[in-house]
Structure formats: C-alpha cells, structure tokens
Amino acid sequence: MLAALYYVLKGDPYKALKEDLESLKKAKLLTEDLRITEKGMELIQQLISKPISLKGKVVSGDGEGRYYLSLEGYRRQVREKLGFDPFPGTLNVLLDPTSTEKKSTLMFKRPIILKGFTENGKRYGEVLAFPARVSGVEAALVIPLKTHHPPEIIELISPVELRKALKLKDGDEVEVLVY
C-alpha cells in the first residue's frame, strides 16, 4: 500500500525514492544504513500530529469526479468512513511547487481507504482519503490509486459544493488543511 501511495504522490517511484533518501540522509534524519535517527523520529511525530497545509489555485476538472461520486459504492463508504454524504463532484486544486513537495508527507498520515468495488460488471479502484478543511469547510482530500491527474493536482470532496459555498472560481487561491 505504501508503495502505491508513494507512486501516486511522487510519480516515478525509483527516482523520487532515491532523491528523498539522499535528502533525508543530508538532513540527518536517516543514517547511511537507512535507520531513522532520533531527529527523524521527532519529525515523524510532528508530521503525524499536525495538519499539513497545501496551497494552490482552483482549476476546472473534466467532470469525472461527478460520475464517480454518483456511484453508490463510493457514496456509501464516504458516508460510513468520512461521516458525510458527498456532493457529487470534486474541487480540483493545482498545488504550488512547495505544496506539491509537501504532498509527499501525506504518507505519514493514516489514510481512510475507500475500497474498490464492482458495479454493473465494471471494476472501480481504491481511493485514499484524508480528512481536510478548506477555508473552514469540512472536506476530504481524495487520491484515487488509478488517476490521470499529475501529482500537482489534488481533488477534494465535501458535503457541499465547495465552489459555491466558498464563492470560488478558476485561479482563486485556496489553502487546504489535511488532518
């Protein structure tokens, strides 16, 4: 599961992993034999307990979120696991470069897994969900394990239409707090 999450978050897993390991060693968070240092453990504890702030600009999607959130297999799981009935659509955000890098720290959070299912003979894949807030409004950042979005695009679901509730249009800047 962690490998799949890493791939979705970072793109090329081997290149990204090698770069990340080198930067962790330089920062004295890992030893040369890849053991987590005391400083590394302190950082992990901070990452687990604090919300992650991601910033970017609202962008239009292709409407696929509306389709997937109309499927009862996903709707039921969102109600049961996230505690809200999702608006049938997603808010797409193009992350700034710093937030795109910070997105990889989601691997330290425990995702809520929306399990894949079969409906009308078609297979739908797993989705990782992370509770979030956008300008104080309840939401969840969702990461389908099969997606066509590049790593710098995130999708948010909510019990309300986020564009309307927050009066957002393409190009507006938003901050997403992921818990």
From Swiss-Prot:
Pathway(s) per entry: Cofactor biosynthesis; FMN biosynthesis; FMN from riboflavin (CTP route): step 1/1
Its EC number(s): 2.7.1.161
GO molecular function, one term: riboflavin kinase activity
Residues that, per the record, bind FMN: 147, 155
Keywords for this protein: Flavoprotein, FMN, Kinase, Magnesium, Metal-binding, Nucleotide-binding, Transferase
Top class in the EC scheme: transferase
Role this protein plays: Catalyzes the CTP-dependent phosphorylation of riboflavin (vitamin B2) to form flavin mononucleotide (FMN).
Similarity annotation: Belongs to the archaeal riboflavin kinase family.
Protein name: Riboflavin kinase
